[in-house]
Amino acid sequence: MFKKALFILSLCPSFALAQSYVVYDFTHNRVLESHASDSIQPIASVTKLMTANVFLENNKNPNCRIAITKEDTDRIKGTGTKLPKNIPISCNELLKAMLVHSDNYAAHALSRAAGISRRQFIKKMNEKAHQLGMYSTRFHDSSGLSSYNISSPMDLVKLAKYSLNKSDIKRLSNLSATYIQAGKQKLYIKNTNKLVRDEIFDAAVNKTGYIQESGYNLVFINKHRCKNATIGVISLNNTSSAYRSSFTKSKLEKFGCTALNGRTIRDVAGEAQYEDGYDEVGFNTLIQKLSK
């Protein structure tokens, strides 16, 4: 079993897995602080920011609806979904599930819902990256489950800045929790980012990401100005969800951002239940399948 696990990991692309980050002033377009900010690493569910942009720009049907099917199953990491299968769901609700709760099945369904094929959708994601000058970025799927979805903190600055132009992304980024209407079901979901979920900071743009190959990632732009500037922190390959939260908070505060009502980070022990993407359960499931 252990040898099989090592074999699986050997199939993943090789990257310099160390934390990289940039603290960026989006008002004056300047780097405030950084470390290895051009380092290329897997970005996991941060991918969904590009998925949202491409969907919003290509979907021409305001009443778009699509069902989650077998086609949307996670065959890479073995993650599940709260969303019911084979029931038409509003694309607006799927967008909410994807950006707030980082639902992978919703991301896959949205890549089929914009009137183009999934392959064409991924092509448009890569074309948009090139258009934005994200030359170190590549996308292989719409969810970020593939470890071949790669980027750098500086490339992600460009995606984050572009996302500020999308009112839907800005609105959904800052939802601490919400309901998803799926047929007759009403599903309660929470934000995968503790800083937003616990209302420590308000977000203008916010997307977490995690697979084992990437570590814990975050693109976060503070909603409120910090000393007359809009400040964002983008970090890849943090060692844990708790560290990602505390690191982001410390950098925001260092450059003049204030936590809402002086709030602090608490109760980090239960963080894993909110994390998106590739978890240990999914990894063990994958090993078991390949060992048969």
Curated annotation (Swiss-Prot):
Gene3D superfamilies according to UniProt: DD-peptidase/beta-lactamase superfamily (3.40.710.10)
Pfam families in the record: Peptidase_S11 (PF00768)
Positions that bind substrate: 207
EC number: 3.4.21.-
Localization: Periplasm
Annotated catalytic residues: 45 (acyl-ester intermediate), 48 (proton acceptor), 102
Keyword Cytoplasm attributed: no
The entry's keywords: Cell shape, Cell wall biogenesis/degradation, Hydrolase, Peptidoglycan synthesis, Periplasm, Signal
Function in brief: Cell wall formation. May play a specialized role in remodeling the cell wall. Specifically hydrolyzes the DD-diaminopimelate-alanine bonds in high-molecular-mass murein sacculi.
PANTHER family xref list: BETA-LACTAMASE, BETA-LACTAMASE-TYPE TRANSPEPTIDASE FOLD CONTAINING PROTEIN
Protein name as catalogued: D-alanyl-D-alanine endopeptidase
